[in-house]
Amino acid sequence: MKELLLWLYGKSARNAHIRDMAEKTVVLLKEKGSMEYQELAQALGIQFNQYKKPKRTFYFVINPLKKIQLIQDKRIFTDKSKKKYKTVYFFNPDAFYGYMKRVLDEFHSEIKV
């Protein structure tokens, strides 16, 4: 997992805490199955009153993991007018496997002579 996180977030020492949060995200979602946005942010140690830009930090951790489909999100609407909702994140290793297989197959077919 460490090498995958290095590919996603880079080797910079400035991103070390982001890589740690990403690893913790994967472990938490693997153990619990799914977590709501606020619950996950709190578990990662992102305090909304302490960080200068907490949402930016949260999505900087989450978006690369969503891009490779290792985690996915789902909106659960809390009212009938569908204006209020909760975002729930969950771990999906099967989607990740499919995504990586497709990427590697495309790469292999392009470099194959």
Residue ranges and their predicted role:
Residues 14-19, 33-37, 51-55:
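Alpha-helix N-cap/helix-initiation sites
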Residues 80-85:
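Short acidic/glycine-enriched loop/turn segments that link adjacent beta-strands
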Residues 1-31:
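Short alpha-helical segments that sit at the start of domains
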Residues 50-68:
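Short amphipathic alpha-helical interaction segments
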Residues 34-46:
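Short acidic, hydrophobic short linear motifs in intrinsically disordered regions
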Residues 87-113:
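Short, amphipathic alpha-helical interaction segments positioned at domain boundaries
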Residues 27-31, 45, 70:
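Short, locally clustered residues in the helix-turn-helix/winged-helix DNA-binding domain
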